Amino acid sequence: MEHGSSRGFIWLILFLDFVSRVTGKTQVDALIALRSSLSSGDHTNNILQSWNATHVTPCSWFHVTCNTENSVTRLDLGSANLSGELVPQLAQLPNLQYLELFNNNITGEIPEELGDLMELVSLDLFANNISGPIPSSLGKLGKLRFLRLYNNSLSGEIPRSLTALPLDVLDISNNRLSGDIPVNGSFSQFTSMSFANNKLRPRPASPSPSPSGTSAAIVVGVAAGAALLFALAWWLRRKLQGHFLDVPAEEDPEVYLGQFKRFSLRELLVATEKFSKRNVLGKGRFGILYKGRLADDTLVAVKRLNEERTKGGELQFQTEVEMISMAVHRNLLRLRGFCMTPTERLLVYPYMANGSVASCLRERPEGNPALDWPKRKHIALGSARGLAYLHDHCDQKIIHLDVKAANILLDEEFEAVVGDFGLAKLMNYNDSHVTTAVRGTIGHIAPEYLSTGKSSEKTDVFGYGVMLLELITGQKAFDLARLANDDDIMLLDWVKEVLKEKKLESLVDAELEGKYVETEVEQLIQMALLCTQSSAMERPKMSEVVRMLEGDGLAERWEEWQKEEMPIHDFNYQAYPHAGTDWLIPYSNSLIENDYPSGPR
């Protein structure tokens, strides 16, 4: 009997292995079909060179992300200079959640078969040359939240089936669509901006009442109703004055873009218990962050800005806030709404229960597990994707100016979410000139920004490089405690000194307890050093960082950089134990400024 059970168990293992191999091979076939359709030109071949048809699973390929069951969940091929057509075989990726093929030269039509991707959350095909209709089959995608097809050549009518989707973001502008704009379902929340520059008929205005013999009665009824509402409003105002701060009147809340909302001050006073100290999540240079609970029981984080206001800045503030709200990406903290009164400026964000990377690294509650190495790698990639989107894919480029572990938040799945972006410009909305105040945090500020006050996307790249070192070491970017051991107070300088002594193991966070892949640590350090070069021009763009983190081009960039830099430095370069790689240590500078703790928010 025992022998039979063992045999049955072995057969079960063999069967599961067979199923796994068949599933993996199906995914390989689907992606190879995509490669065959898109592989034109030397650059494209380089982008997809790791896609090997002989592999059992595609999970080791560049630009492909898998879950723990080796199912493909994400394709990241945005801005990859691809040409060709989409293929119906993409439907053979049943667990695909994110299909990112924006800003290429893709032609042809959207395959109907994409409607079979039942796990799809985000479909980004914008900025291509795709033609034909929007497939009605997309209406079957019950989990689709982000649909961006703008800047293509799509034609025909908008399928009514799309109105049933739980969309948070919709943009099908700048196409050749015709017919009516649906007004029901999720489409009711989107403004005309989502449909602009098409051949669509405008949405019908609300019908006006036709003249009749009862018009006088209607007027009387309306007047009576208005009087009743006025009396009720007066009573409520008297009733609420004992429970709320008395503030000047503000505009009624309204929806601007998607679910972006203007909240009333009273809503947020109730949500935060009048900005109670016990709801404080953190303090920063832009203001205080509070935990809040809305009337529908949704948890939010409310940032109470502390900037000085001058007369006439309200419209510019609202414009900048709406611009920030349009930056929507899986790895960006989405702005849910705002509140603006003569005395308050408030921003409302989703609440992040897992806090920030900084809090997970250095303020972890007792009993909570440390961030393991796979999570840290995933955080590095996710935050890079978010920053790359801010730099390259927003209508107006957004430079963060304070990239650090405390501003990289973690959602319920420990996905990295870049927070506090756009605030540097927002807080200067009354000033059209270059600011003389250098914004940022000690240890993260790029030397050229510190010396000249001029910022660029490369300023963020520097901060990102330091954040990578925080992920690897678990330490703060600036820490006076290191003086006790005669070490550099700047994390970047300390890392350089340790690397000169070839003590890689002493760099890695002790909380990992040795559970990391040494070659992967080396690669992240290489990336951090490339990002923190003293010359802004020599640093990679964030889009390049994403590709290198996905395994595309890091070795070549590192080798090239070493050859260029080696004659400049006067200390001895010894090959660090890593496949003939020299560790090159460039110069950097920093500014002393306080940082703030950041727990769940």
Curated annotation (Swiss-Prot):
It catalyses: L-seryl-[protein] + ATP = O-phospho-L-seryl-[protein] + ADP + H(+); L-threonyl-[protein] + ATP = O-phospho-L-threonyl-[protein] + ADP + H(+). It is a single-pass type I membrane protein. One of its GO terms (cellular component) is mitochondrion. Keywords: ATP-binding, Cell membrane, Glycoprotein, Kinase, Leucine-rich repeat, Membrane, Nucleotide-binding, Phosphoprotein, Receptor, Repeat, Serine/threonine-protein kinase, Signal, Transferase, Transmembrane, Transmembrane helix. The modification Phosphoserine is found at residues 356, 359, 451, 456, 506. Its main location: membrane. The modification Phosphothreonine is found at residues 272, 298, 435-436, 441, 452, 532. Residues 25-215 are extracellular. Residues 1-24 form the signal peptide. Serine/threonine-kinase of unknown function. This is Somatic embryogenesis receptor kinase 5. It comes from Arabidopsis thaliana. The lineage of its organism: Eukaryota, Viridiplantae, Streptophyta, Embryophyta, Tracheophyta.
